[in-house]
Swiss-Prot record:
The reaction(s) this protein catalyses: ATP + H2O + cellular proteinSide 1 = ADP + phosphate + cellular proteinSide 2
Subunit structure: Monomer and homodimer. Part of the essential Sec protein translocation apparatus which comprises SecA, SecYEG and auxiliary proteins SecDF-YajC and YidC.
Annotated family: Belongs to the SecA family.
Keywords for this protein: ATP-binding, Cell inner membrane, Cell membrane, Cytoplasm, Membrane, Metal-binding, Nucleotide-binding, Protein transport, Translocase, Translocation, Transport, Zinc
Species, as recorded: Helicobacter pylori (strain P12)
Pfam entry (one): SecA_PP_bind
Organism phylogeny: Bacteria, Pseudomonadati, Campylobacterota, Epsilonproteobacteria, Campylobacterales
Protein name: Protein translocase subunit SecA
């Protein structure tokens, strides 16, 4: 209340920002007459001078220089746009451009020309000479926006490229990323970053820098997509029959008897009766014994699949596959898969072929990918409801830009009915009334199932209409464009078709413009606002209204008791509704509860990913060093050799050979032979003093002797590529271990321990172990390389060329959870096979290799226990 009063007196923070930007607008406008008089060549030369000025400035002062040249850059870009695109930037669009350049989010209503606004900040920031990325939600928008704006950028002397899923050739992608301005989707940019960090040559990396990115529909990408990490993965060996068995058990269990459902948190809680039934059906005496952990996990996922996930709402079945439906856009998320075995559980539920689970090979969240950029900005029509999250997670402030023309759309109060049937009856009546009048209507639904229900009702009433949901996503832009035609009735799942303008004729404006009907409130107010925002663009007339029922998910789960009480007191008859600001406010409060739950969920995911992100950055930085030909790999190998020997000698009773028993000396001899391919006579070990120096010099001289056949360039390249392979294999194993740790970490809460604190502590220890493993594995591997002559070295180089080529061209596609067709653990022919860290130890101790011989060495001689 006090905040609102102060805001009215001195203006809000947003008002003060707009006031500052308006001063700059006056400066830009004052330059317009000067540039209008220039010829095209003179205008282009003026822009070239700006490039020279910015690029001649020291790197850390370039941002300051950009602010100095902003008025000229914006004025030239506007003049160029007038000549090339026949579009002049409005004053409010200039403000939007300045907001983007300041690394903020510009909230601009539908139809205000966000695509044109972006050109101002893009052209300005590209002056620095580093690629600027423009990020969109789908390939269609990336291609459309780049093609529309390309003539303008070319006039200004910039090159433009577009990255879409259809660009498969590596050389072509490399060429596109070399452009000054690159358009593409969030998925393409994210996966290219991951793929870059699986490359075996710096020259093959496509993303050279992360200087500046503008994210269009920023709320969709940085909020809605934030819970879905980008994952590249390979197959994991799991028994497929377990999924089917778990599905059978889940289908036989009864709600409230064998398990309860927590709809708010989308969780299943198995009762004691349910545990007994499951144990009986699985044929085990204790479902939660360690050896039955996989079964209990499969059952949890099968229960979720059968009782929390619904066909035509959360997913569809097409071409013998389970395909996810994006809960925010209603689009099909082809190629994306639920993790932790849930997708396989859905496949078992629907009786389609079950695909293997996969092991993570590389992953990153959108949060951590986009936070890498030196400067990040965004555009959307709906951001204020998530302003806190944008600021807290991304350090992005939201600035609401005034519209060029006043909004004339009428947003009517919600109408609430007792049942879904009554609600849909009322919706059909309203659609019929509008259709008879010729006024176009866009109807928003929350799921495919509801859009199909509405489709059937309209068909029954013989009202011509078009349905746009995940099943018709290929015609999305075309259908949405036609939604403003006379008499058009369009049903859209959530906000499919976002980014495509619905333009109205004067006749339609006379009829009242586009009428929006929402058939259900979404969990997020922002999605509802997006639906409303399809109407009333650029001062057009329009109307929006939501029709709700007490049976809607949002009201049923979060907010119906109070509203239901009001309806009962009013004694409403069938077909009657209530309409009041009080009720609308109650619905919005329910939405705020859900939004907060989702925010906490995304924040929780980020807290965990931040732990992995620090490790990821460290590993990727080391990878880049190894790819650099100037890196002193010889020093790294020497350091690893010293570390490996220290590990061996730290296990000896003493560092003086006189105190070593014959058995220990024999054990040392065997370890040197088996792990380091070093042949040392027992009597030499007995004579050596100090023994550590003797062994170190022996390993070093053996290695140097066999590397003599290589010239310095050959040697450096072979050593760096081999080390990269060791690093990559160890990193993949580490990610697998981290996945397993994350899966079970929440159980620590039952032991009164904070799961996040435990995760941080254990993941840190795992990372230290990972680093140690690399050092030991590296020196073992290098010790076993054999080059007897120059032919061997030439063969090795050819092998490494092929190896690098294979690694970079494995079957990687651009998906939310990638699946590689082949086993990625490629080993050089010359190396002895070492078990994976999580495989059973070959010594048959019953322990995992990492907990056994990987630490202590073979069970003989020196390390016998």
């Amino acid at each position: 209340m006090i905040k609102a009063i102060i805001g009215k007196i001195i203006g809000t923070r947003n008002d003060r920002w707009i006031k500052q930007y308006k001063k700059q607008v006056l400066t830009i406008n004052a330059l317009e007459p000067t540039y209008e008089k220039m010829s095209d060549v003179e205008l282009q030369n003026a822009f070239e001078e700006l490039k020279k000025r910015v690029r001649s400035t020291e790197k850390d002062l370039q941002e300051k220089t950009l602010l100095e040249v902003l008025p000229e850059s914006f004025a030239i870009t506007r003049e160029a746009s007038k000549r090339i695109l026949k579009m002049r930037h409005f004053d409010v669009q200039l403000i939007g451009g300045m907001v983007l350049n300041d690394g903020k989010i510009a909230e601009m209503k539908t139809g205000e020309g966000k695509t044109l606004v972006a050109t101002l900040a893009v052209a300005l920031n590209a002056l620095k000479g580093e690629s600027v990325y423009v990020v969109t939600v789908n390939d269609y928008l990336a291609h459309r926006d780049s093609k529309e704006m390309e003539p303008l950028y070319h006039f200004l002397g910039y090159s433009v490229g577009t990255i879409t899923a259809s660009v498969r050739d590596d050389d072509e992608r490399l060429e596109i990323y070399s452009k000054d301005i690159v358009y593409g989707t969030n998925n393409e940019f994210g996966f290219d970053y991951l793929r870059d960090n699986m490359k075996y040559s710096l020259e093959h990396k496509v993303q050279k820098s992360h200087a500046f990115a503008i994210v269009d529909e920023v709320d969709s990408i940085l909020i809605d997509e934030a819970r879905t990490p980008l994952i590249i993965s390979g197959p994991v060996d799991r028994r497929m029959e377990n999924y089917n068995k778990a599905d059978e058990v889940a289908k036989s269990m009864q709600v409230e008897i064998d398990f309860t459902i927590d709809e708010k948190n989308r969780a299943i809680l198995i009762t004691e009766e349910g545990i007994k039934k499951a144990e009986n059906l699985f044929g085990v005496d204790n479902l939660y014994k360690i050896e039955n952990a996989a079964l209990s996990h499969h059952l949890d996922q099968a229960l979720k699949a059968n009782y929390l996930f619904f066909i035509d709402k959360d997913y569809i079945v097409a071409n013998n596959e389970v395909v996810i439906v994006d809960e925010f856009t209603g689009r099909l998320s082809e190629g994306r898969r639920f993790s932790e075995g849930l997708h396989q559980a859905l496949e078992a539920k629907e009786g389609v072929s079950i695909k293997e689970e996969s092991q993570t090979l590389a992953d990153i969240t959108f949060q951590n990918y986009f936070r890498m950029f030196s400067k990040l900005a965004g555009m959307t029509g709906t951001a204020q409801t998530e302003a806190t999250e944008f600021l807290e997670i991304y350090n992005l402030e939201v600035v609401s830009i005034p519209t060029n023309l006043a909004i004339k759309r009428k947003d009517l109060n919600d109408l609430i009915y007792k049942s879904e049937k009554e609600k849909f009856d009322a919706v059909i009546l309203k659609i019929k009334e509008l259709h008879d009048k010729g006024q176009p209507v866009l109807v928003g639904t929350a799921s495919i199932e509801k859009s199909e229900t509405l489709h059937a009702l309209l068909k029954k009433e013989r009202i011509p209409h078009t349905v746009l949901n995940a099943k018709q996503h290929t015609k999305e832009a075309e259908i949405i464009k036609d939604a403003g035609l006379k008499g058009a009735v369009t049903i859209a799942t959530n906000m499919a078709g976002r980014g495509v303008d619905i333009k109205l004729t004067d006749e339609i404006k006379e009829l009242g413009g586009l009428y929006i009907i929402g058939t259900e409130r979404h969990e997020s107010r922002r999605i509802d606002n997006q639906l409303r925002g399809r109407s009333g663009r650029q001062g057009d007339p329009g109307t929006s209204q939501f029709y709700l029922s007490l049976e809607d998910n949002l009201l049923r789960i979060f907010g119906s008791d109070r509203i239901k009480g009001v309806m009962e007191k009013l004694g409403l008859k069938d077909g009657e509704h209530i309409e009041s600001k009080l009720v609308t406010r109650a619905v919005e409060n329910a939405q705020k509860k859900v939004e907060n739950l989702h925010f906490e969920s995304r924040k929780h995911l980020l807290e965990y990913d931040d732990v992995a992100n620090e490790q990821r950055k460290s590993v990727y930085k080391f990878r880049d060093e190894l790819l650099d030909a100037s890196y002193d790999i010889g020093a790294k190998i020497a350091e690893n050799r010293e570390y490996a020997l220290n590990q061996i000698f730290s296990k000896l009773k003493a560092f003086d050979h006189q105190n070593l028993s014959e058995e220990e000396l024999l054990g040392l001899k065997n370890v040197l032979k088996e792990d380091f391919n070093a042949h040392v006579a027992l009597e030499d070990l007995e004579k050596a003093s100090p023994i550590e120096k003797f062994v170190a010099e022996k390993l070093k001289s053996d290695y140097e002797n066999k590397m003599k056949v290589l010239d310095s360039e050959q040697r450096s390249r072979i050593e760096r590529i081999v080390y990269l392979q060791i690093l990559d294999n160890a990193w993949r194993e580490h990610l697998y271990t981290m996945d397993n740790l994350k899966t079970g970490i929440n159980l620590r809460g039952y032991n009164q321990k904070d799961p996040l604190v435990e995760y941080k502590k254990e993941s840190y220890n795992l990372f230290l172990e990972f680093i140690e493993d690399i050092k030991i594995e590296a020196i073992k591997t290098f010790s076993k390389i054999q080059f007897e002559n120059e032919q061997d070295s030439s063969d090795a180089e050819r092998y490494l060329d092929n190896f690098s080529e294979e690694r970079e061209h494995e079957s990687v596609t651009y998906r939310h959870e990638e699946t590689l067709d082949e086993d990625l653990n490629v080993a050089m022919k010359a190396f002895a096979k070492t078990p994976k860290r999580n495989e059973p130890c070959p010594c048959q101790s019953g322990k995992k290799y990492k907990d056994c011989c990987a630490k202590s060495g073979p069970k003989k001689g020196l390390f016998a226990k």
